[in-house]
């Protein structure tokens, strides 16, 4: 017993290599700002993919301004119910098989219906109580949803189905809402509104980019996702420029500071060769933690509040940065990979990806730290 206590004591205070610091006050600020910008809509907070990498349970618990939650998978919905969430939950991809339907009934989970197979499963099921259904319309993205020419037949069958709670609800999804000059979005809005005009059920069209850029798409419900976490859906503006606060700050620290001479290379493949005598910092984070291996030389990192470029290929557990010849940084000093002072959007742009991918790909090696 004494040995066990000693072992636990020795591991309680060790320094984690990488930590994602989640600012729950920033989350609540962002939700309030969404409500101000879509004052006539109810808010369905999208918390799929572990709350966009921020922690499903913590996000749901502190998203007090949300009227409902949207998830992609049934297991995400069940996690929410297990941690005490009683607000409505919608399966945005719908159920995958007829065997899922009793689980939806038991746990009061709403579902999207987007295809003939789901409709047939609903018609053939024997359920204790009806399920709230959102009919997904393919208004132009051509990923999920019933085509406009199928719409009326689906509506009639869903209205006749005793397993469907009335009134039926309606939704669609934009393909290019983040591109202000793209003609596709106005066409999608026009088509969706024309199909659902006069319907009794509630409707939802706008996700993050839609609710921010296309006010006419703010219907009875909006579905904020990435913007809720303080990350912009737009390629030309950060969330901070839109008034939102980044919720996640990804941190690590220097584990070595090394002198590198002009002409010497650093890292696997010798992809970076120093042009001058300099100091290189080694940071304890890599692709094993979810930081992209594809990050090229020059990708910015903050060390002691100053931007420095990645120098050399990202490895599994480490990455290296050029601190400069006059650097005074030391082992143990803080490094920020993205956060309030280094937007994830900027980092993603250097890497050639989107910030959505950065925040959702962190692995279990990264410590999650929450402040409220």
UniProtKB/Swiss-Prot annotation:
- What are the N6-(pyridoxal phosphate)lysine sites (modified residues) in this protein? 48
PROSITE patterns named in the record: ALANINE_RACEMASE (PS00395)
**Where along the chain is substrate bound?**
143, 316
Q: Quick one: a GO cellular component term?
A: cytosol
Gene Ontology biological-process annotations: D-alanine biosynthetic process
Annotated SUPFAM superfamilies? Alanine racemase C-terminal domain-like, PLP-binding barrel
Q: Pathway membership of this protein?
A: Amino-acid biosynthesis; D-alanine biosynthesis; D-alanine from L-alanine: step 1/1
HAMAP family recorded for this chain? Ala_racemase (MF_01201)
Give the function comment from the record: Catalyzes the interconversion of L-alanine and D-alanine. May also act on other amino acids.
Family (UniProt): Belongs to the alanine racemase family.
Listed PANTHER family? ALANINE RACEMASE (PTHR30511), ALANINE RACEMASE, BIOSYNTHETIC (PTHR30511:SF4)
Protein name as catalogued: Alanine racemase
- Give the encoding gene's name: alr
């Amino acid at each position: 017993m004494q040995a066990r206590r000693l072992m636990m004591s020795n591991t309680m205070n060790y320094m984690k290599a990488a930590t994602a610091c989640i600012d729950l006050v920033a989350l609540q600020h962002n939700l309030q700002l969404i409500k101000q910008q879509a004052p006539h809509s109810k808010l369905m907070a999208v918390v799929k993919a572990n709350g966009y990498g921020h922690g499903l349970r913590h996000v749901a618990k502190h998203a007090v301004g949300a009227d409902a939650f949207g998830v992609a998978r049934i297991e995400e919905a069940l996690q929410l119910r297990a941690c005490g969430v009683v607000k409505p939950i919608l399966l945005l991809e719908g159920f995958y098989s007829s065997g899922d339907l009793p689980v939806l009934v038991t746990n009061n989970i709403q579902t999207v219906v987007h295809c003939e197979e789901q409709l047939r499963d609903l018609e053939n099921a024997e359920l204790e109580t009806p399920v709230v259904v959102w009919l997904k319309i393919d208004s132009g993205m051509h990923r999920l949803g019933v085509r406009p020419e199928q719409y009326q037949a689906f509506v009639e069958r869903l209205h006749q189905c005793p397993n469907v709670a009335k009134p039926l609800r309606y939704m669609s999804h934009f393909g290019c809402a983040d591109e202000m000059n793209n003609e596709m979005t106005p066409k999608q809005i026009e088509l969706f509104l024309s199909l659902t005009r006069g319907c009794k059920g509630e409707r939802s069209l706008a996700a993050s980019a839609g609710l921010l850029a296309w006010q006419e798409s703010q219907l009875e419900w909006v579905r904020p996702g990435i913007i809720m976490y303080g990350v912009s859906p737009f390629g030309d503006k950060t969330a901070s420029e839109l008034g939102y606060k980044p919720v996640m700050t990804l941190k690590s620290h220097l584990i070595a500071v090394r002198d590198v001479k002009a002409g010497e290379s650093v890292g696997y493949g010798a992809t970076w060769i120093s042009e001058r005598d300099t100091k290189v910092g080694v940071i304890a984070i890599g692709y094993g933690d979810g930081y992209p291996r594809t990050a090229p030389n020059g990708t910015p990192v903050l060390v002691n509040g100053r931007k420095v470029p990645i120098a050399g290929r990202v490895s599994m557990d480490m990455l290296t940065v050029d601190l400069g010849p006059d650097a005074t940084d030391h082992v143990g000093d803080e490094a920020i990979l993205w956060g309030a002072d280094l937007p994830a959007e900027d980092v993603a742009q250097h890497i050639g990806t989107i910030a959505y991918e950065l925040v959702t790909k962190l692995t279990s090696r990264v410590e999650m730290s929450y402040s409220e």
